[in-house]
Amino acid sequence: MSTIKSVFAREILDSRGNPTVEVDLTTEKGLFRSAVPSGASTGIYEACELRDGDKSRYLGKGVLKAVENVNKILAPKLIGLDVTKQGEIDRLMLQIDGTENKTHLGANAILGCSMSVCRAAAAFRGLPLYRYIAELSGNKSPMLPLPCFNVINGGEHAGNKLAMQEFMICPTGATSFHEALRMAAETYHNLKLVIKKRYGMDATNVGDEGGFAPNIQANHEGLELIVEAIKQAGYTGKIEIGMDVAASSFWDAKESKYDLGFKVPADKKTPDMLVSGEGLIKLYEEWTSKYPIWSIEDPFDQDDWATYTRFTELIRNRIQIVGDDLLVTNPKRIVEARNKKACNALLLKLNQIGSVSEAVEACRLAREVNWGVMVSHRSGETEDAFIADLVVGLGCGQIKTGAPCRSERLAKYNQLLRIEEELGANAHYAAKTLSGVGH
């Protein structure tokens, strides 16, 4: 039988020590457990992550309300349903919530159930999770993704003065996933040596996602450090750079400009730290000419559509422009961005939209117009490796899930190694074949 026998949620802690939701679902096949991630820099259009707001517990970040919503509202409705009806179950949960942004039940409550349903259905069908997701999404070619490793952390993810949030290494010259992982790990260790030599041992402390957080202020310094590490590791021309600028986090609405010094003390700020959208475009053009950058995520504020469209028109044939805060994995925002030609790739985050079915639909909409799709973790992660199976099953060809450091990040990379091993001669590695460049 593929019917749900029980559903139970609990409050656990994520990799930042903040509470999150974990859901256990049982069928005759056994117990299926899923844990929900959480972001630090979040887009204003994301689905609602329900927090308790009780300052006496976890500084207001508790999730007992979301847990209660699973145990008292969703569980009674889900028991007895067929786990192989993913779309119907997800739609039912959205119906019960009844809000545009999942503010009633919380996306963290709905997603935990949705992921566990997916796992249970895969077990019922006797399929690995990635195979079942491929079937669910209509994808006939599971594919190992190009991994993008966040090796220097700034922005909301680190206590340094870097405005831009992530500087990533992307092994575009690898021929397999295991080779890509080795290349990245070797470059990561070389980067540690470069940073240690230049800034001292304490500069090699790591941020939320396992990347280094040296106390540098100029964003181009981060790029130069990575270029040096790639060279030292012997991978010049085989590893390129990706960036997550997370520009919404330093958009100054009052000045209608971008504040590159938003983490710098007021008395140390200089006028040139405030730049216009046009100024940022010039900066990115300069960097993409000078450094081996192939992907830039969230280069502008989530509502700065005009600048996105202008930038994409200028540079889409050279690099991938990824929408994260711009799109929030939301089909409506994706359609709007498609119409405005505002970017050429989607960052797909399960908890931004809040259910497996909606994430599958978001991927479909992006691939329909040949956009790249990069599946992503969040800065607050758990040992749950669902997204590793998701990216292979969807066959979208790109993943970012932190540095090759910290167990909650390696849980995903190691699962991808296992999947590659299981596929054997049928394992296909995406490299850059599914990027949004040129679209």
UniProtKB/Swiss-Prot annotation:
Its EC number is 4.2.1.11. The keyword Lyase applies. It catalyses: (2R)-2-phosphoglycerate = phosphoenolpyruvate + H2O. Mg(2+) is required for catalysis and for stabilizing the dimer. Pathway: Carbohydrate degradation; glycolysis; pyruvate from D-glyceraldehyde 3-phosphate: step 4/5. It is an enzyme of class 4 (lyase). GO terms for molecular function: magnesium ion binding; phosphopyruvate hydratase activity. GO terms for cellular component: phosphopyruvate hydratase complex. Its main location: cytoplasm. One of its GO terms (biological process) is glycolytic process. Gene3D superfamilies: Enolase-like C-terminal domain, Enolase-like, N-terminal domain. Mg(2+) binds at residues 244, 297, 324. It is found in: Cytoplasm. The keyword Metal-binding applies. Substrate binds at residues 157, 166, 297, 324, 376-379, 400. Keywords: Cytoplasm, Glycolysis, Lyase, Magnesium, Metal-binding. SMART domains: Enolase_C, Enolase_N. HAMAP family: Enolase. Homodimer. PANTHER family: ENOLASE. Belongs to the enolase family. This is Enolase. It comes from Mastigamoeba balamuthi (Phreatamoeba balamuthi). The lineage of its organism: Eukaryota, Amoebozoa, Evosea, Archamoebae, Mastigamoebida. The gene is ENOL.
